[in-house]
């Protein structure tokens, strides 16, 4: 594949700078999964901040963006926001904003967004206001579902005549769909 190893990860025998790599510890190979088209997307745990000494966020997001483009699958960065629990203030929130903006700038077509770990950090009492801050700064508009161009989706036509009867939902759609 010619992919260089990302910071914080090893691939095909390259040494990991920090943490561990699932290939050699739990025998999972997510790059093989997207290469072989067995999965539609990956959500790598990109749990480091931009200021991390050996595994800064930027080079990792760039590496996974290259992998997503090369293998034609989506990758959603799983960002940790648990560090916010140590200091609930907007200067710490700005690191999350930087990561979202880096993801958007590095997209290369197949990196359509991010997800956060953990919901306790997002909605818990320690980080009250984070969700509102993100809505104000980077999530002002609804997101569209990214196209999975590798599927040939049928044209299902417009749904009409939607009815709910008890627990049964029915509708009229294009015939033979």
What are the roles of these predicted feature ranges?
Residues 1-26, 72-84:
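Aromatic-lined carbohydrate-recognition surfaces of secreted/lumenal glycan-active proteins
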Residues 50-109:
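Surface-exposed substrate-engagement region within the catalytic domains
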Residues 88-147:
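C-terminal active-site rim and adjoining tail of enzyme catalytic domains
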Residues 20-54:
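Aromatic- and acid-rich polysaccharide-binding/catalytic face
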Residues 42-44, 75-79, 112-117:
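Hydrophobic faces of well-ordered beta-strands that scaffold small-molecule active sites
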Residues 128-176:
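Pro/Thr/Ser/Gly-rich low-complexity, intrinsically disordered linker/stalk tracts
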Residues 2-6, 47-52, 81-85, 119-123:
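Solvent-exposed loop/turn segments at secondary-structure junctions
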């Amino acid at each position: 594949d010619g992919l260089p190893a990302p910071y914080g990860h090893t691939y095909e025998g390259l040494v990991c700078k920090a943490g561990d790599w699932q290939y050699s510890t739990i025998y999972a190979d997510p790059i093989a999964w997207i290469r072989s088209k067995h999965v539609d997307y990956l959500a790598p745990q990109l749990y480091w901040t931009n200021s991390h000494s050996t595994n800064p966020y930027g080079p990792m997001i760039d590496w996974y963006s290259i992998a997503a483009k090369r293998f034609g699958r989506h990758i959603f960065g799983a960002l940790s926001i648990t560090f916010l629990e140590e200091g609930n203030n907007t200067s710490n929130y700005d690191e999350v904003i930087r990561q979202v903006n880096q993801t958007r700038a590095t997209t290369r077509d197949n990196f359509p967004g991010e997800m956060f770990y953990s919901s306790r950090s997002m909605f818990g009492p320690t980080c009250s206001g984070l969700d509102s801050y993100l809505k104000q700064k980077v999530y002002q508009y609804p997101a569209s579902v990214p196209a999975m161009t590798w599927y040939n989706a049928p044209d299902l036509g417009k749904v009409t005549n939607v009815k709910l009867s008890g627990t049964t939902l029915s509708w009229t759609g294009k015939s033979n769909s």
